[in-house]
Curated annotation (Swiss-Prot):
UniProt protein name: L-lactate dehydrogenase B-B chain
Native organism: Danio rerio
Active site annotation, chain numbering: H194
SUPFAM superfamilies: LDH C-terminal domain-like, NAD(P)-binding Rossmann-fold domains
Keyword field contains Ribosomal protein: no
Subunit details: Homotetramer.
Lineage, highest ranks first: Eukaryota, Metazoa, Chordata, Craniata, Vertebrata
GO cellular component, one term: mitochondrion
Gene: ldhbb
Gene Ontology process terms (BP): lactate metabolic process; pyruvate metabolic process
Length: 334
């Protein structure tokens, strides 16, 4: 006797379907990983989402929770597994795994604790998705993006750190709040390290093409009577403040990562401040990853915008690079 399914559906094709073309994998289903996953789903960027973690019960629970919302989503397949075979044929892999930053802890103090974890993760990702683009989110993101590049063997344009995309978003929000406009109407960039030594590009800050530095030549300096420099200090302190208040940061970085994912998936050629290999740029001679304005497209980092920086801004950028290299040079087994 025919089943309900057989009576209801008449198949016209029974062969194998093509593998997913826009599969996204998120490694690590903690607060940040799930914020990235949900943001990608809500922006309809993936035709398959894979989740990977070592904590199997939580992993399965997160997968089921998302699957139960399938009616409200347009991603036909959501899978998970401890084994990296579940990530096969990913176009973009978002790496959020690692130990969490504690209150008052510098991102750079996290490095050695996370490097050993990456030694197990990255080779497995590349094994199953050799053509993927890697977006590293785990902190300290600049050093761990360098570590990922070394461990993966992938070309530098396909290994990207989330970098100062979020720092710049915080900067634009805080500056726009003070100016009484929407964040998208304030143009400003934070470059360098994602964290304590980030570099605000005051020389390029503008609204509708009007340079704030021309209106106030001292903007961002200690001599500035309006104390705009305080805004950058708030950017640096904001992550620590959120961690103090709620224990972690997740929503803003999730939205930021989805923004990067969209530019790559849709080949948008949008410019984002993300962490990329900067050796040979701005007089930096070491192999370090720092955030510069990068054109993101289907290749990953398609190109880097040569921003006109002041002597002081270049000096700060070099200082960022020196600090990161000082840590990287002592890393082993890369």
């Amino acid at each position: 006797m025919a089943s309900v399914l057989q009576k209801l559906i008449t198949p016209l094709f029974s062969g194998p379907l093509e593998p997913p073309r826009n599969k996204v994998t998120v490694v690590g289903v903690g607060q940040v990983g799930m914020a990235c996953a949900v943001s990608v789903l809500l922006r309809e960027l993936a035709d398959e989402l894979a989740l990977v973690d070592v904590v199997e019960d939580k992993l399965k629970g997160e997968m089921m929770d998302l699957q139960h919302g399938s009616l409200f989503l347009k991603t036909p397949k959501i899978v998970s597994g401890k084994d990296y075979s579940v990530t096969a044929n990913s176009r973009i892999v978002v790496v959020t795994a690692g130990v969490r930053q504690q209150e008052g802890e510098s991102r750079l103090n996290l490095v050695q604790r996370n490097v050993n974890i990456f030694k197990h993760i990255i080779p497995q990702i590349v094994k199953y998705s050799p053509n993927c683009i890697l977006i590293v989110v785990s902190n300290p993101v600049d050093v761990l993006t360098y570590v990922t590049w070394k461990l993966s063997g992938l070309p530098k344009h396909r290994v990207i750190g989330s970098g100062t995309n979020l720092d710049s978003a915080r900067f634009r929000y805080l500056m726009a709040e003070r100016l009484g406009i929407h964040p998208s109407s304030f143009n400003g960039w934070i470059l360098g390290e994602h964290g304590d030594s980030s570099v605000p590009v005051w020389s390029g800050a503008n609204v509708a093409g009007v340079s704030l530095q021309k209106l106030n030549p001292d903007i961002g300096k200690d001599t500035d009577r309006e104390n705009w420099k305080e805004t950058h200090k708030k950017v640096v302190d904001s992550a620590y403040e959120v961690i103090r208040l709620k224990g972690y940061t997740n929503w803003a970085i999730g939205l930021s990562v989805a923004d990067l994912t969209e530019s790559i998936m849709k080949n948008l050629n949008r410019v984002h401040p993300v962490s990329t290999m900067v050796k040979g740029m701005y007089g930096i001679s070491d192999e370090v990853y720092l955030s510069l304005p990068c054109v993101l497209n289907s290749a990953g980092v398609g190109s880097v915008v040569n921003m006109t920086l002041t002597v002081d801004e270049v000096s700060q950028l070099k200082k960022s690079a020196d600090m990161l290299w000082h840590i990287q040079r002592d890393l082993r087994d890369l």
